[in-house]
Amino acid sequence: MARKTNTRKKRVKKNIETGVAHIRSTFNNTIVTLTDTHGNAISWSSAGALGFRGSRKSTPFAAQMAAETAAKAAMEHGLKSLEVTVKGPGAGREAAIRALQAAGLEVTAIRDVTPVPHNGCRPPKRRRV
């Protein structure tokens, strides 16, 4: 049987001026996804994808690096300004927003879309260290 050669599709350079940055910041990781206004992903990055492991993955510095990486990739597609939606209680929320601004993207709005339960699931037990 003939072996199939791995052919990767060439990335098409999109020309997108405005977009949305979705920052998901949990206690363990921070994921930054940059999309166009319709929600189609342009670029993404996370602290874990950059090689941070364990407790270092949840630091503000790791979130900053993830946001910078995602911003650089999105700026190659022509992204200039964006709205930011932040979800979750993690440490990397503010650091990720600051990193997006420092990368040269204009932040027009910041929206907190953290889901708040109307007394849904029982929370995890308190930690005793």
Curated annotation (Swiss-Prot):
A GO BP entry: translation
InterPro entries: Ribosomal_uS11, Ribosomal_uS11_bac-type, Ribosomal_uS11_CS, Ribosomal_uS11_sf
Keyword Protease: no
Pfam families, per the entry: Ribosomal_S11
Keyword terms, alphabetized: Ribonucleoprotein, Ribosomal protein, RNA-binding, rRNA-binding
Subunit description: Part of the 30S ribosomal subunit. Interacts with proteins S7 and S18. Binds to IF-3.
Protein family membership: Belongs to the universal ribosomal protein uS11 family.
Name used for this protein in its record: Small ribosomal subunit protein uS11
Organism: Bacillus cytotoxicus (strain DSM 22905 / CIP 110041 / 391-98 / NVH 391-98)
Gene (UniProt): rpsK
